[in-house]
Amino acid sequence: MISIERLSKTYPQGGLPMVALEEVSLEIPTGSVFGIVGRSGAGKSTLIRCLNLLERPTSGRIQVDGRELTTLSDRELRLQRQNIGMIFQNFHLLHSRNVWDNIAVGLEIIGMPKAQRQQRVAELLDLVGLSDKAYAFPSQLSGGQKQRVGIARALAAKPSYLLSDEATSALDPETTASILALLSDINRQLGLTIVLITHELDVVKSICDNAALLETGRVVETGAIADLLSDPLSRLGRSLLPTCGPLSVSATPRAELTFFDTLAASPVLSALAQQHAVGVTLLGGGVEFIGGQRVGRLHVDFNRPEGGLNLAEVLQFLNDRGVRAELI
């Protein structure tokens, strides 16, 4: 687990320091794909560079698996960084070396014997789908292939954590999808914890199971994707799964329904109609695949039965069956 406690980072700038991060606190669960989303200038890249002390924070604590990074000696920090791989937007490949050597260079630096190094590079090339490009040079690769080399290189020392700093922002949508699918596979196969910086909500939708929203150096909200989507006040949840748009004025009670994964709303609504004699009119909505699960959001009108409508019972009936219902 990565635990960040009251992390701040300021830069000297004339009379007043520039505040890049202010009192940031986060818990990143082991094995998760954690997205940190925000606009340009929000402090995302500064935060991720603090996680392996490429940027040293001005104050605060960073614990990785219980070890406080800011108190480590230079030697201890070098060893700790072997457990934290990192990929970047601009790949940072050595253009004078082929794919094989770009992956092997980090293993050479840490002194891995040649036979082990060769075996490890071959494993990584197979993992990222580049076995046929082992002796190609960066100039001969597409953007997606270059990023796959970057991923292989980041995984060379078998880290437990992978930091991704806008790693797909320079790629086209199709290539982005393939890189995200690869990262998702790596997360599942290796149990790797991935911390992913992005300004694109589609990236969070595609791969993340936890997320945080960063604005002007502060964490505005954070949580599991399912919890954010279930929270009617969550800005991130609303952005990931927008509402159905403006609706006409209605004289009947109206609700927003949110449901998850394999749960289908229609059988629940049918049961509601049968047990409570409530007519349900579907106004709009949709289903998307977010955070590895199907999520649906519907707007409905409840038509009053002859005997009247007990809204509290109706909402409780839906919530008891896993459909979050809120009057709108």
Swiss-Prot record:
What is this protein identified as? Answer: Methionine import ATP-binding protein MetN 2
Reactions catalysed, as given in the entry:
L-methionine(out) + ATP + H2O = L-methionine(in) + ADP + phosphate + H(+); D-methionine(out) + ATP + H2O = D-methionine(in) + ADP + phosphate + H(+)
InterPro entries for this protein? AAA+_ATPase, ABC_transporter-like_ATP-bd, ABC_transporter-like_CS, ACT-like_dom_sf, MetN_ABC, MetN_ABC_transporter-like, NIL_domain, P-loop_NTPase
Keywords of the record, alphabetical order, are: Amino-acid transport, ATP-binding, Cell inner membrane, Cell membrane, Membrane, Nucleotide-binding, Translocase, Transport
Q: What topology does it adopt in the membrane?
A: Peripheral membrane protein
- Oligomer and partners: The complex is composed of two ATP-binding proteins (MetN), two transmembrane proteins (MetI) and a solute-binding protein (MetQ).
| EC number of the protein | 7.4.2.11
Q: What cellular component GO annotations does this protein have?
A: plasma membrane
Organism phylogeny: Bacteria, Pseudomonadati, Pseudomonadota, Gammaproteobacteria, Enterobacterales
Its EC top class is translocase
| Pfam families on file | ABC_tran, NIL
Record-linked Gene3D superfamilies: 3.30.70.260, P-loop containing nucleotide triphosphate hydrolases (3.40.50.300)
